[in-house]
């Protein structure tokens, strides 16, 4: 099964964002990942509405929005109108996550939940039947360049067992290196949000990196 490769555009070169999008698109990435932050749920600010518009305008690939914001349900229609294909919410930021996920589905958009390192599986298990994607944060959300939190692997292993019943895809986000991609693929992870650890700021061209990341497991075996 081919891995889902998702560049985190927060790590891209903003001086030439359009060129970055076009190169990543032609390199064969699967989903463009956009981090939206409000400075409240996480102590940082991410990409804005104009960034989402520019990305959507320059690619036909899937685009997701990771809403690291308070009350995400209030913004579902806004991001749906911008043309995103997948919306992730953090359930702990929403008084009514079931309603918000239903609102996402009603707009014919894929629904996802993002799980912080400190969020328990028990607290989100009732949402699993109604989501398409579960994104596990392997760092604390809000900043690039953090170290991978190994204790999260236990949570990933539990989700791999649960997805056999509920049929969602498992994504991981945070300090994802090539080595981690190989190991996490073996655990049963479907896709990877990639930043500076594996994709951006390298001397290689994106097309060469993406090709290798999609095939690294087969080469290792």
Where are these regions (language model features)?
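Catalytic cores of alpha/beta
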Residues: 73-81, 119-129, 176-192
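Hydrophobic faces of well-ordered beta-strands that scaffold small-molecule active sites
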Residues: 4-8, 32-34, 63-67, 87-89, ...
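Glycine-rich phosphate-binding active-site loops on the catalytic face of alpha/beta enzymes
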Residues: 89-95, 135-145, 187-209
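Conserved anion-binding
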Residues: 16, 74-75, 85-169
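Alpha-helix-loop-beta-strand connector modules within alpha/beta enzyme cores
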Residues: 45-65, 103-112, 152-170, 212-221
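N-terminal active-site wall of soluble small-molecule enzyme domains
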Residues: 36-103
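Glycine-rich beta-to-alpha transition loops that act as phosphate-gripper elements at the mouths
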Residues: 8-11, 46, 65-72, 93, ...
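Conserved, mostly hydrophobic/aromatic
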Residues: 17, 24, 35, 79, ...
């Amino acid at each position: 099964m081919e891995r889902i490769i998702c560049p985190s555009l927060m790590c891209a070169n903003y001086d030439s964002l359009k060129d970055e999008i076009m190169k990543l698109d032609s390199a064969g990435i699967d989903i463009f990942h956009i981090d939206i932050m409000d400075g409240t749920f996480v102590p940082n600010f991410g990409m804005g509405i104009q960034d989402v518009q520019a990305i959507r305008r320059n690619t036909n690939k899937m685009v997701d929005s990771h809403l690291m914001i308070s009350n995400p349900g209030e913004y579902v229609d806004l991001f749906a109108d911008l043309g995103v294909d997948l919306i992730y919410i953090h359930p702990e930021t929403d008084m009514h996550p079931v309603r918000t996920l239903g609102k996402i589905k009603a707009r014919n958009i894929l629904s996802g939940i993002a799980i912080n390192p400190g969020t328990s599986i028990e607290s989100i298990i009732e949402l699993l039947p109604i989501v398409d994607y579960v994104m596990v944060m392997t760092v604390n959300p809000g900043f690039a360049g953090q170290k991978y939190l190994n204790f999260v692997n236990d949570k990933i292993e539990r989700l791999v067992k649960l997805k056999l019943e509920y049929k969602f895809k498992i994504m991981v986000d945070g300090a994802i290196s090539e080595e981690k991609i190989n190991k996490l693929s073996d655990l049963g992870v479907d896709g990877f949000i990639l930043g500076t650890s594996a994709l951006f700021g390298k001397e290689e061209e994106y097309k060469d990196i993406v090709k290798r990341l999609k095939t690294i497991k087969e080469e290792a075996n």
